[in-house]
Swiss-Prot record:
Cystine crosslinks: none
Organism in which the protein naturally occurs: Nostoc punctiforme (strain ATCC 29133 / PCC 73102)
Catalytic residues, chain numbering: C50
GO BP annotation list: chlorophyll biosynthetic process; protoporphyrinogen IX biosynthetic process
UniProtKB keywords: Chlorophyll biosynthesis, NADP, Oxidoreductase, Porphyrin biosynthesis
UniProt similarity note: Belongs to the glutamyl-tRNA reductase family.
Name of the protein in its database record: Glutamyl-tRNA reductase
């Protein structure tokens, strides 16, 4: 069996490609079902965020499994395989294991050390289990990755002062305008990213903030989190009129198509009116054609890289500390992985000994008579089970703990010969 990951991220693909391969949560179930139906995919998990799409699989034939994922991605994105392939990365076993650890630890994020990714990996694990994509191997891998991510956050200072996509967008806005306090700011959307936007805008001095959202209740819940700030709430029907009176617009909605484009802005903006748009959504909320308007500037998540680069340089040493922790978690997973080879032998031995125990117990109880057997069966059964477990405990622990592959296989062969076991290897 092999673990493989195929995906693309902010490192390998521009936002125009990433938005075509964003799989929203309501579509995860059908995507897992389709991938799991392929003949060479035994387990599957999907991690989809604004900056990455990664598909993790367990497969007996890595080349075939990777080919099936690539075909799925081409069909989903409606991009030709040759065009798509240049944006994909493909990693096998040890590299795939280290990769998911780095992702969970925030070391592969656009914003080094950002905290949201750990929750997203947790969601990937939960949905993979819920929709029957994740079984024994990926379950262990994602549990180990979540442990790794938590260790990175608690045992290093990588999370202290780390910026997020939202804070990077606000920082970029601060670079582009002279004074945030003098700007009328609109946020489209009322989710977690929008909450972070409000938080960072207030910390940078913004005072006039409006939220436009489809659900008024959700927007009001967000506004209540900042009681010291008079935040205005507007329904979606007022979006364009609110934008027309604004200086800065931040977009963070779950829309799958652009909600702002050149035509819409032309209809409401005065001729000399300047406007800056910061789109942190993937798929994008703002169409690229708005940049054709003379006094309009639009920025997307890929434009945040310059801001993020400064953050990375100051945090490189912390990242190196985190890498050492990840190596420990990779080793822990690898020890477990290697122990899988012993599962069949141990299972066969247990079954054989259990069969003998049950047969001998039945003989003993029949000799003791029904009255005695009924009265003491539970005690005698517990006694025999305890003896069997204690006898088997040390050999099983020793077998699992053999680090050397050849030594472990010799131990298995010895057990199989001594106990006349019919065990076939399932893992190689």
């Amino acid at each position: 069996m092999n673990i493989a990951v195929v995906g693309l991220s902010h490192k390998t693909a521009p936002v125009e490609v990433r938005e075509k391969l964003s799989i929203p949560e309501p579509q995860i179930e059908s995507a897992i079902a389709q991938l799991a139906s392929y003949p060479h995919i035994d387990e599957v998990a999907i991690l989809s965020t604004c900056n990455r799409l990664e598909i993790y699989i367990v497969t007996s034939e890595a080349d075939q499994g990777i080919r099936e994922i690539t075909q799925f991605l081409a069909e989903y994105s409606k991009l030709p395989v040759l065009s798509l392939r240049q944006h994909l990365f493909m990693l096998l076993h040890d590299d795939a294991v280290m990769h998911v650890m780095r992702v969970a630890g925030g070391l592969d994020s656009l914003v080094l050390g950002e905290g949201q990714i750990l929750a997203q990996v947790k969601t990937t694990h939960k949905l993979g289990q819920q929709y029957n994509g994740i079984k024994t191997i990926l379950n262990r891998l994602f549990k180990q990755a979540l442990t790794a991510g938590k260790r990175v956050r608690t045992e290093t200072s990588i999370g202290t002062g780390a910026v997020s996509i939202s804070s990077a967008a606000v920082e970029l806005a601060q670079i582009k305008v002279a004074n945030l306090a003098a700007c009328r700011v609109v946020i489209l959307g009322a989710g977690k990213m929008s909450r972070l936007l409000v938080q960072h805008l207030i910390s940078k001095g913004a005072v006039e903030i409006s939220i436009v959202n489809r659900s008024r209740d959700r927007a009001q819940e967000l506004a209540k989190l900042f009681p010291q700030q008079p935040i205005k709430i507007h329904p979606l029907s007022e979006m364009m009129s609110v934008i027309a009176d604004s200086d800065l617009v931040f977009t963070s909605t779950s829309a799958t198509e652009p909600i702002l484009d050149r035509v819409k802005l032309e209809m409401v903006l005065e001729v000399q009116r300047s406007l800056m748009l910061f789109d942190i959504s993937v798929p994008r909320n703002v169409h690229a054609d708005v940049n054709e308007l003379e006094n309009v500037q639009a920025f997307n998540v890929d434009d945040l890289k310059a801001v993020v680069a400064q953050n990375y340089e100051s945090r490189r040493k912390i990242a190196q500390e985190a890498e050492k922790l990840l190596e420990e978690e990779v080793e822990a997973f690898d020890i477990w992985w290697r122990s899988l080879e012993t599962v069949t032998t141990i299972s066969c031995l247990r079954n054989k000994v259990e069969t003998i125990r049950e047969q001998e117990l039945e003989k003993a109880l029949s000799r003791l008579g029904s009255e005695f057997a009924e009265k003491h069966q539970e005690v005698i059964e517990a006694l025999t089970r305890g003896i069997v477990n204690k006898i088997l405990h040390d050999p099983m622990v020793q077998l699992r703990s053999q680090q050397d592959v050849e030594a472990r296989r010799r131990c298995m062969q010895t057990l199989q010969m001594l106990f006349n076991l019919d065990a076939e290897e399932q893992f190689s």
